[in-house]
Design a protein with these regions (language model features):
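Active-site-proximal beta-alpha core segment in soluble small-molecule metabolic enzymes
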Residues: 1-103
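Active-site anion/phosphate-binding pocket segments in diverse small-molecule metabolic enzymes
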Residues: 7-12, 23, 73-275
Length: 275
């Protein structure tokens, strides 16, 4: 485990801990995102962090906050962040500080600002072969191949009559006799409740089906009236890495979020199968 030192005050508190050895850590530099990190031009405070005898400093890093944008002002801001970071690293080294491994770029930093070279690159979302959303800027186009699919199974199949309701709140009322199926995924697994009654599509046995009614904690219901062959245990695709209509980006867009949030919220109850 390697700790992040988020600022000078944090580093000072380390001195009060009863540690049996120096704390392995990386130092976070705030170059403009203003989330965590000691500000890049607070050189006196930064030097005190690096001279803290309780720290074993293995690296130094910052984070770009608009590297995925093609807006002129955002590109200029990112370039300024890079300039601030490089200047800070240079000054620390000139003062004799060992900054360790240096890293700045995450996925879009690596794609759009790859002329900058550091020791590490923190690849995140593009490891899944997807973009954060369909509007994300890529200066250097990558032919990304999605690798993640999300599946559930049919747990029940039944017929309902016209005017029957489905799930909590009776938000779906059948306008005709329908065939429906319950499937084994809900908002506790990362299928957000906000997608209830949004004409969300899933795929079962090669057929698209709509999610109907409110999404429950552990289950949801789909309309399978037009699916001729369906039975308990059949696989249902919520995300299909080989189907653009069931992409992670489209799922996230429908939930008014980004794929980073959606994928990070997939619950631990979901088995991970690597192939």
């Amino acid at each position: 485990m390697i700790q992040t030192i988020v600022d000078y005050n944090y580093s000072e508190k380390i001195k009060d801990l009863k540690l049996s050895q120096k704390l392995n850590c990386h130092i976070k530099i705030n170059t403009g995102m203003n989330r965590i990190g000691e500000r890049y031009d607070n050189m006196d405070r930064l030097i005190k962090i690096y001279e803290n005898p309780r720290l074993n400093i293995l690296g130094t890093f910052s984070h770009l906050c608009v590297a995925d944008s093609d807006k002129k002002e955002d590109i200029e801001f990112t370039e300024k962040q890079i300039e601030n970071f490089n200047k800070c690293i240079k000054q620390l080294k000139e003062n004799g500080q060992d900054v360790g491994k240096v890293h700045l770029q995450s996925s879009y930093g690596a794609i759009n600002y790859n002329t900058e070279t550091y020791d590490y690159v923190r690849i995140g979302i593009i490891m899944y072969g997807v973009n954060s959303d369909n509007t994300a800027y890529q200066k250097n186009k990558l032919d990304l191949k999605p690798v993640l699919s999300l599946k559930a199974r049919v747990t029940s199949v039944k017929e309902i009559n016209k005017d029957d309701s489905v799930s909590y709140g009776r938000t779906y009322i059948a306008d005709s006799n329908r065939k429906i199926a319950s499937i084994s995924i809900g908002y506790a697994d990362g299928f957000p409740r906000c997608l209830s009654n949004k004409n969300m599509l899933v795929k079962v046995n090669g057929n698209y089906s709509k999610v109907i009614g409110r999404i429950c904690m552990d289950q949801c219901v789909i309309d399978v009236t037009d699916v001729k062959e369906i039975k308990t245990g059949d696989v249902v695709y919520i995300i299909d890495c080989d189907d653009i209509n069931l992409s992670s980006e489209k799922f996230a867009m429908n939930a008014d979020t980004i794929t980073n949030e959606f994928l990070s919220r997939l619950g631990n109850r979901l088995p991970r199968i690597r192939s």
